[in-house]
Amino acid sequence: SRSQMGGYADDPWVPLNWLIQNRVKQLCPKKSDGRFFPTLNDSSGMSRLELIDWLKGIFERHHDAKIAWIDPFMEDVGIELLNRLGTATADYLVITTEKMSNDDSIKEADEPNRVENLLARCSGWNNGYFGSVCLKILSVPDKKLHDRMILIRSANGQPLAGYHLSNSVQRASEKHPLLVTPIPLDVIPQVFEYVDQIIQSTLYGEGNPHLPARIIFNSADISPDLLPVD
């Protein structure tokens, strides 16, 4: 007998089935951690609420993690969101700069600037309802920060998740939309190493008596106010 190789053709329904599957994946893609928040005008005012829900979900999912929120122009609104949405079992680190924002440049001389407003928001920490989370705010040199990110690692330092933000959360939806892009797991270790190097070189630099970074707020240094006894 004689064997013959090849000559097999798929049944007619096979390519059609693949075509349908691919089309369904395009129309109904698997839900990712990425988000797009339109401006308030383009979302009938809903995008701000959706953003708050997204942040709340991130903080609750990582309720006992170490979370770094990096924003060169962090404002008091961001601190308020951390306090409202953060958990008491996580550690939060805000990394920002003391660079003047565009709003600062148009303020009157006697008006508080961005950083002053931020610290004023922290001044009532552990006073009543405000300030239930463990928070540090690190100010680094202007040139060290550009991107806005939220980076999450476990208590033992293992990277868990990361998100790149197209603009500042506190300004999101006012004039520009906000795109949140998950950082791929194979890239996250490099991002953490980059941020750790910024902290190490500016806050703990060996042999430099004039370190350019400083912790401008640490909730651990604030003692809770004693409540009056009836």
Residue ranges and their predicted role:
Residues 66-68, 161:
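Structural motif
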